[in-house]
From Swiss-Prot:
Ranges annotated as biased composition (Basic and acidic residues): 854-872
A Gene Ontology biological process term: mismatch repair
Record region (Disordered): 854-880
Family in the record: Belongs to the DNA mismatch repair MutS family.
Keywords, ordered alphabetically: ATP-binding, DNA damage, DNA repair, DNA-binding, Nucleotide-binding
CDD domains in alphabetical order: ABC_MutS1
This protein's name: DNA mismatch repair protein MutS
Organism: Clostridium beijerinckii (strain ATCC 51743 / NCIMB 8052)
Domain of life the protein comes from: Bacteria
Gene label: mutS
Binding-site positions, ATP: 613-620
Length: 928
């Protein structure tokens, strides 16, 4: 058996678009067949049916009404599918044989804009990555706004991953020859759809990219930028099936002109979404984005993603914000006009894509109506930036007048249904409307006349697209119908429909005029659209100014509402913040509840602030606060503080919080070390680094050693010495102040009250004396038995009391089983035996363990001091359960002596010898 002719055509089309779900137009439905039908049925929960395709088995099939496609396509695209729309290219009534069909558009995650989406303030970016031996080229576009930009940089993987994290593309094009390891790394940081193409073949010509932009713009491209841009343009042509006139400016940018923030730091600082909810609420963007327009919202987001590092540019933006902040009436008038402006960028995108309707045109007109008042307002401005906006803002009065004269105030939604052109714009339209109106009046007169003639009051004249105009009479009035007056056309359950020759003649006149009118209005609308399309460059320029102006106005409004101050900007390596506040936490808990803190970082005595103190006390909040204030200053925003003097930072790095990568086979500690390694390799003397609890994912000695070494590396490396906030629970590190250059101790103030503590959340000079971990556990609601036992264990571990390892609570005793974990320089020894009844038996049990034998060379090394032995005997007499009392300090002392004896002084350089001596002295003091 062979496939039917229609199915043969379907299979040809499907083969060409094999990576897409094919929406195949059949009448009023889009149909999917075979695997596509199964996929769509599953993903959209549609009924799966079958269709005779000419084979023995029916082809799996599912379908959706064509008018409902807009509701279904986003769901597929958001799941990572591509959708190819195959339309009927001719009227089925006029077709000879199989109806001609063709794919008119491919909708992908990187090229789709959902008009009904709540994410209108977000960009939908499509990215191309081209990799040469030494360089990487990127091209990025949002086809809905017409943005198209490119950059290149040294072939360093982390730089590429950081840029992907910043741009957050929905779809990424890569060369099919790219390494799988790089693809895996990209997939590890983004959920974007990865599309592979052969860049040697999938690329537009040099002439095509020049036609899209200009010879001048293209001639300045280096090889990597040119190739990535040509590939990206090819993909846009392929998916849109046309050249988009709104993509008319090729912008080159340098990543070194913006602050570098890696993906991990963006996440930790919660710049655009919260860690917990993965939503805008709770992020810095949530605080700063009160934009009046969608364009302004995208601009605020872009500024947060790309802080400036050139002082003159920062101060220029700050000057605009400052003027809007200082003149409340100016900003209120400005925002009053801005709030009535629609998304001009995306309306222009619809014009370019031939997808604009009459209501979009009215939105454009309403937006342009506000430009004269905004221009007039800017004429009163004094700041350099606002003056530039005034000089460059095109009021677009010619376009506004065209729309004012041509588009009806309440047009049809579809441009193919008529009722879109305003009366008086075109004389032929006016004449046809009169003909149509007279025809409708004639129909109304006919209905009244027939009612009087027949005496049937319920008689009515109606219309539908199948039968045209008809006279409808209910069955109860059949006997009142004059014989021979009407011709029966249709029988219904409770009525009959009739026609007359006179009615059909008038129908032809009415419908003829209506059809002509609809076609004429459509033609006029496309002419208007094409006229405006020629002015896209002007529209985009004014839209860019409006979006930036909204960004400036919004930052001024936020500063006023939240009592922010204008920061001073310096390049001297000094960060001085007085009464700094965390912008997001303050917003959540309320200004009156938040405790402000001062911060001083410099390149002399306060290069690295070593912050100690308990959990829950506010260390992480404080550290993030400093980073966010710095970032806000560099986007040109006022900051939450009484005063701030911010040195420009080229990069912000954070290592905060615990996370693992189980899929990648990395533990929490491995991830932590990878992050620290990345920071130490890429930070510079102009960077701001936040390190929280480095080394906590391993044993105490290992963790302490790593944390210590990291601090030494940062402060001792002349090419690094970056401004650093270093929070730790290793209180031994406080002794580094005065020993290592630039280290300064700070802690979180705590107020003790009997058995409880109050965290004052105030950062003060000096190191913390306690961690208050048990108090935090108590605040968290742990049972009293657990808290009390923890205190007892703590006393034992600190050597202030004997430690009973058998006892779980003050009243319960473990049966005659004991598990003793002896930690010595990361070698863990576990003993699980019945309770030892004497010192000699305990030693024998220890000797039986191979791992412990390796750590201790002979039986003489296992000495239990007199205090422990006497205590054990005393406890044995008191308690028949034979519980063993151990003083764990003897293990630490023996380990310490062994470490001292094994130090090879001759193999150490002077710095290593000093460090070793300092560490051994510190450990010896603990064992007193």
């Amino acid at each position: 058996m062979a496939l039917t002719p229609m199915m043969v055509e379907y299979m040809k089309t499907k083969e060409e678009y094999s990576d897409c779900i094919l929406f195949y137009r059949l009448g009023d439905f889009y149909e999917m067949f075979f695997d596509d039908a199964i996929t769509v049925s599953r993903e959209l929960e549609l009924v799966l049916t079958g269709k005779n395709c000419g084979l023995e088995e029916r082809a799996p099939m599912c379908g959706i009404p064509h008018h409902a496609a807009a509701a279904y396509i986003p769901r597929l695209v958001n799941k990572g599918y591509k959708v190819a729309i195959c339309e009927q290219l001719e009227d089925p009534k006029e077709a000879k044989g199989i109806v001609k069909r063709g794919v008119v558009k491919i909708i992908t995650p990187g090229t789709f804009i959902d008009a009904n989406s709540s994410l209108e303030n977000d960009n939908t970016y499509l990215m191309t990555i081209y990799e040469s031996d030494e360089r990487i080229g990127l091209a990025v576009s949002d086809i809905s706004t017409g943005e198209f930009k490119t950059t290149s940089f040294d072939n360093i993987k982390i730089t590429l991953l950081d840029e992907i994290s910043k741009v957050a593309p929905k779809e990424i094009l890569v060369d099919k020859n790219i390494s799988q390891s790089l693809i895996d790394d990209i997939k590890g940081i983004t959920t974007a759809l990865i599309t592979e193409k052969d860049f040697n073949e999938f690329i537009v010509s040099k002439e095509e990219i020049i036609d899209q932009f200009s010879d001048l713009e293209v001639s300045g491209l280096v090889n990597e930028r040119e190739i990535s841009s040509r590939v990206l343009l090819k993909y846009i042509y392929e998916t849109q099936k046309m050249s988009l006139t709104n993509i008319n400016l090729l912008e080159q940018y340098e990543i070194i002109n913006y602050m570098t923030i890696d993906g991990n730091s963006r996440r930790n600082l919660e710049l655009t979404e919260s860690i917990r909810e993965k939503s805008k609420k709770g992020s810095l963007l949530w605080v700063l984005d009160k934009s009046a327009t969608s364009m302004g919202g995208r601009t605020i987001r872009k500024w947060i993603e790309e802080p400036l590092i050139i002082k003159s540019e920062i101060e220029k933006r700050l000057s605009g914000v400052s003027e809007a902040f200082s003149s409340i009436s100016f900003n209120e008038d400005l925002r009053s006009s801005l709030k009535d402006i629609y998304d001009i960028e995306r309306i222009v995108g619809k014009i370019s894509n031939k997808n604009v309707n009459a209501k979009d045109m009215l939105s454009l007109k309403a937006s342009l109506d506000k430009l004269p008042s905004i221009k007039e307002l800017l004429g009163t401005a004094n700041s350099e930036l606002l003056k530039e906006y005034y000089e460059n803002l095109d009021e677009l009065s010619d376009i506004r007048e065209l729309l004012e004269s041509s588009i009806k105030e309440e047009p049809s939604l579809s441009i193919k249904e008529g009722n879109i052109i305003k009366d008086g714009y075109n004389s032929e339209v006016d004449e046809l409307r009169q003909s149509k109106l007279h025809g409708k009046e004639w129909i109304a007169a006919l209905e009244n006349r027939e009612r009087e003639f027949t005496g049937i009051k319920s008689l009515k004249v109606g219309y539908n697209k199948v039968f045209g105009y008809y006279i409808e009479i209910s069955k109860s009035n059949y006997n009142s119908i004059p014989e021979g007056r009407y011709v029966r056309k249709q029988t219904l359950a409770n009525a009959e429909r009739y026609i007359t020759e006179e009615l059909k003649i008038m129908e032809d006149k009415i419908l003829g005029a209506e059809e002509k009118l609809i076609n004429l209005e459509y033609s006029l609308f496309t002419d208007i659209r094409d006229s405006i399309e020629k002015e896209i460059a002007r529209l985009k320029k004014s839209a860019r100014i409006i979006s930036n102006l909204d960004g400036i106005s919004t930052l001024a409004l936020i500063a006023l509402e939240n009592d922010y101050v204008k920061p001073e900007i310096n390049e001297d390596g000094i960060i001085e913040i007085v009464d700094g506040r965390h912008p997001v936490v303050e917003k959540v808990i309320g200004r009156g509840e938040f405790v402000s803190n001062n911060t001083t970082l410099n390149q002399s005595d306060k290069e690295l602030l070593l912050i100690t103190g308990p959990n829950m006390a506010g260390k992480s909040t404080y550290m993030r606060q400093v980073a966010l204030i710095t970032l806000m200053a560099q986007i040109g925003s006022f900051v939450p503080a009484s005063s701030a003097n911010i040195s420009i930072c080229d990069k912000i790095f954070t290592r905060i919080g615990a996370s693992d990568d189980l899929a990648g086979g990395k533990s929490t500690f491995m991830v932590e070390m990878w992050e620290v390694s990345n920071i130490l390799k890429n930070a510079t003397s102009k960077s701001l680094v936040l390190l929280d609890e480095v080394g906590r994912g391993t044993s105490t000695y290992d963790g302490l050693s790593i944390a210590w070494s990291v601090i030494e590396y940062i402060t001792g490396n002349e090419n690094l010495r970056c401004k650093t906030l270093f929070a730790t629970h290793y209180h031994e590190l406080v002794k580094l102040e005065g020993v290592l250059p630039g280290v300064k101790n700070y802690s979180v103030a705590v107020k003790k009250m009997k058995d409880s503590v109050i965290f004052l959340r105030k950062i003060v000079e000096g190191g913390a004396d306690e961690s208050y971990g048990i108090e935090v556990a108590k605040l968290a609601g742990l049972p009293d038995d657990v808290i009390n036992r923890a205190k007892e264990i703590l006393l034992g571990l600190e050597g202030e009391n004997n430690f009973d390892i058998h006892k779980v609570t003050n009243t319960e005793i473990i049966e005659n089983e004991v598990a003793v974990d002896i930690n010595q320089a990361n070698n863990v020894v576990t003993i699980t035996e019945k309770a030892c009844e004497s010192k000699s038996e305990y030693i024998e049990k220890v000797e039986a363990k191979d791992s412990f034998d390796k750590a201790k060379s002979n039986k003489d090394d296992h000495r239990i001091d007199e205090k422990t032995e006497n205590s054990s005997k005393k406890h044995k007499n008191k308690d028949s359960s034979n519980n063993m009392q151990l003083d764990f300090t003897f293990i630490e002392k023996e380990a310490f002596l062994k470490e001292v004896s094994e130090v090879d002084i001759l193999s150490l350089n002077p710095m290593e010898a000093m460090n070793t001596l300092y560490r051994l002295v510190a450990e010896a003091k603990k064992l007193k």
